[in-house]
Amino acid sequence: FTLIKLRSMRSDAEAGGSKWAEKDDPRITRVGRFIRMVRIDELPQVWSVLKGEMSFVGPRPEVPAFVTMLDKELPYYAERHVVKPGITGWAQINYPYGASTEDARHKLEYDLYYAKNYTPFLDLLILIQTARVILWPEGAR
């Protein structure tokens, strides 16, 4: 499926290939900084949820180039795809913004925990914690 987001980076941001966003990334526009800070860049993904391509809660979908790389570098990375991707997830509320393979390894642990221990109560807990993260935006890039 195609991940829909509000554009927060310059249109040529990935001209040299995909790369993780960094703190104070110069590719992010002024408007982009605001929409990332208030996390509204994710709002269009509700359409993907309504179409059944995503869930509100699940492992965050990743850029295809990163998926290919991480599949090779991280054992069990593909296992995170046994559940639908989500707008928010266990990794997002428990680990700060990741921008490296090592960060992806840590987030994978949370994604696998979620896939193995999914319950409606866990989804509710994640949604409540997501509201906290949106209201007090720590770690947005």
Annotated model-derived regions:
Residues 1-141:
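Conserved small/aromatic sequence motifs within transmembrane helices
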